[in-house]
């Protein structure tokens, strides 16, 4: 789609050319008026275009929310979860989360001792490896907090058993984000499970078929959305 200021530009160029003809040449104010109008209309056209883009974006956002689609940021605590005893399949995690929405960010946090083979496997499965020389939890928590303020993300999924992420999760929920936690026993923090909107335990939900997972998702995860919707409707009724 052509932006309106381009159409205005073409129209005014024609007027300007006409003003160059001998029949209008003596009317210098006419030419000046064309130039002034060009710059004025160009700015107006730019403003109108931006407003149209903003309106279109809002309409799309509302339609997306009605359908229950989520834009998910997936953060995986590598040292805590990518262990032989858990035998985690990153593709399976992606498949399970696809039931909730689209994964727009997928990161695997690793320490400096991660093998080249593991890093290569993470990349080959379409995830972004983030290698830290320090505490992996700190870097992951910092990124998680930044995502709380990202308007393009409405759901944050953690793959971890660690309660260190509770502050970041609380902040996310305060800002209206949904939180999914994927973990495994032993050592899966009870506090982490209680604060999440939806919990997936590796070894349980990962063995469920698609129909059962969909049923569990609707029964628990989407109830949070219904409560949020009721809250918004109540606030709208209270407005004068």
From Swiss-Prot:
Question: Tell me, what's a Pfam family for it?
Answer: NYN
Provide any one GO MF term from the record: RNA nuclease activity
InterPro entries linked to this entry: CHP00288, NYN
**Descriptive protein name:** Uncharacterized protein MJ0482
Organism listed in the record? Methanocaldococcus jannaschii (strain ATCC 43067 / DSM 2661 / JAL-1 / JCM 10045 / NBRC 100440) (Methanococcus jannaschii)
